[in-house]
Amino acid sequence: MSNHLPGVFIVSDSIGETAEMVVRAAASQFNSGNMEIRQVPNISDTETLEEIINQAAASNFIIAYTLVINELADFLKMEARKKGVICVDVLGPVIEAFKSVSDIEPRREPGLLRKVDEMYYRRVEAVEFAVRYDDGKDPRGVMQSDIVLVGVSRTSKTPLSMYLAHKRIKVANVPLVPEVEPPEEIFQVEKGKVIGLVINPEQLNQIRTERLKTLGLKGQASYANLERILEEMEYAQEIMKRLGCPVIDVTNRAVEETASKILEIYYRRLSHV
């Protein structure tokens, strides 16, 4: 017996983060100074495992592993037992527990947690992107985006940008206003990336009037004036015609329904790239 913790080989058919976190958490319960950890990720063959077992036996290390491929895990357990090396299966018992109380078979596919993490971070990145490049704040976002939404005010550009961001799609949106020249970038991006949004003028009039009321302003302001709305719509349609972009009518459509149409266009474009 020793007053020091043994070294540990972290062995995984993915990157080994899970096993390392568990090992460090366990080691923190012992006041024995530093512990040597040797990490061996992306294991895919028994030859590498055999080499690790031999090194562990020679150095008096233990092995902590996350191997979801049964053949590799079985080989490691059998050969380690022969050499007197202690092996700790970090993931297997939990997988078997889930399996025992359900009719679901585990996928036995390495790296799934990392894929989930990557999806999460891509979603966060897309949400941050939507906030940063909302309402034409910075035209640089147009070139970096997956989709660019254009349309007059209150055509659901921002809600759609956020909804699509939660599907890990980076969306910039640009308001079309007669007095403001749209950024040149929307004419420079690849065809099909820009999508126009239009709406029935009377419905837009109602939406804007309600918006003004929530802000404590009078509904008679030019922003909600039907004549002004028609002027804006005409200008927006001219820009969309110049762009040659697909156009979606959002009248009486829920955000989810419009987003579905946008995704159809988006995936169709990707399939032709």
UniProtKB/Swiss-Prot annotation:
Broad class of enzyme this protein falls into: transferase
Positions with a binding annotation for ADP: 151-158
UniProt function note: Bifunctional serine/threonine kinase and phosphorylase involved in the regulation of the pyruvate, phosphate dikinase (PPDK) by catalyzing its phosphorylation/dephosphorylation.
Protein name: Putative pyruvate, phosphate dikinase regulatory protein 2
Lineage: Bacteria, Bacillati, Bacillota, Clostridia, Eubacteriales
Reactions that this protein is recorded to catalyse: N(tele)-phospho-L-histidyl/L-threonyl-[pyruvate, phosphate dikinase] + ADP = N(tele)-phospho-L-histidyl/O-phospho-L-threonyl-[pyruvate, phosphate dikinase] + AMP + H(+); N(tele)-phospho-L-histidyl/O-phospho-L-threonyl-[pyruvate, phosphate dikinase] + phosphate + H(+) = N(tele)-phospho-L-histidyl/L-threonyl-[pyruvate, phosphate dikinase] + diphosphate
EC annotation from Swiss-Prot or TrEMBL: 2.7.11.32, 2.7.4.27
Keywords from the named record: Kinase, Nucleotide-binding, Serine/threonine-protein kinase, Transferase
GO molecular function, one term: ATP binding
One Pfam family from the record: Kinase-PPPase
PANTHER family per UniProt: PYRUVATE, PHOSPHATE DIKINASE REGULATORY PROTEIN 1, CHLOROPLASTIC
Family affiliation: Belongs to the pyruvate, phosphate/water dikinase regulatory protein family. PDRP subfamily.
